[in-house]
Amino acid sequence: MKSLEIEEKINKIKWCRRSNSSHFLLSTNDKTIKLWKVFDKSLKVVAENNLSNELTPSGPVGGGGVPRPPPRSSFKDPSLLKLPRMTHHDTVVAAVPRRTYANAHAYHINSISVNSDGETFISSDDLRVNLWNLNIQDQSFNIVDIKPANMEELTEVITAAEFHPTSCNWFMYASSKGTIKLADMRQRALCDEHSKRMPPLWYECVYDDGFFFNPLIVFEQEEDASSRSFFSEIISSISDVRFSNDGRYIVSRDYLTVKVWDVNMERQPVKTIPIHEHLRPRLCDTYENDSIFDKFEVVFSGDAENVMTGSYNNNFMIYPTDQEKDTEIVLQADKSAFKAKKVGVPTPMNRGANGKKNGSRSTSPVGPGSRMKKETDADQIDFNKKILHMSWHPYEDSIAIAATNNVWPLPPSHLYLHLIVVRGNIN
């Protein structure tokens, strides 16, 4: 047997829904999931004690004063003694682990997602998805298992999984083949019939919540056979998948594109946004430096009118989900973003001779703290500076970006001017 050291890192963090004044979150590394309680901890110091009246005029102890020996008669009477008095000094954020969920995954965990019922969550690795109860740490249920009897027959792995934001029975998981599978736990205990090449069940079910649902929905866009290459399977692998807050839309990210799907139309995405189309001729280079395996996240805005994802050179982009709009905002996570006094104007993506968007941008005014033109020359791209992780506030236009070793929070006042241009409220 070999002892394998588990790297000290956090793969995913998810907030639990609040049921009281306490805050809880789930975190996971490659093998272990933990539930944390997060709270404000009050730090107190001694403000008054028995020596408080026996100090030099220069100040109390700890503030520069030097205590002098008390008179011999100071504490002869017990009534003169008093308990130390504590006062509030500072408030810090503290976290304590409440539960540990371990020994359920044979492969590295890539996703966790908390259910809308506030009681359960799922975790996924390369081949399985497990269902947990937040209150039970030593037992889980396997709801997806795509491991073949012979591992040589393995053709895909699970890359991400997420619960539906409002219906506690639905969840989806994405694969390295570029497919998204939407499953309903009310159908059966193991929700992977399509993964095991079972015959499809062409029927719809109606439930009390009013949803019509085919339990075997697979979202997949057929690939053009003429454009298939050695890298096709790698670049089609989905690195992240999210529901919109209302559960109507799904957004997915692969290496070259972002796709927006309607849950009622699985045959093709309602919008495909080119992200790294300028890197297609340089896929050999990205393969050699392993950049082609970078896992970029994608997020919806709270109203689902925009999506945001990251790129290289510490750039991140915001796009409208409306099919009729092709405007793009490119921003860069650097210190100048917080010194900006004016905002650049986003420009539409250029179209090639065939009328399709080619992912390049026309020149546009650039305000301090913004980059309205994404670098399209692969030789000028710094592949070590990349935006992989991000978050968008569910109720306001505030975002948080992780760039190298820094977190960049952008408040509504900075983001608002960019978004109103995308939403078409100003010319």
Feature-to-residue mapping (PLM):
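Conserved beta-strand element within WD40/beta-propeller blades
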Residues: 24-29, 121-124, 171-175, 250-253, ...
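Blade-level signature of beta-propeller repeat domains, shared across WD40, Kelch, NHL, RCC1
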Residues: 389-427
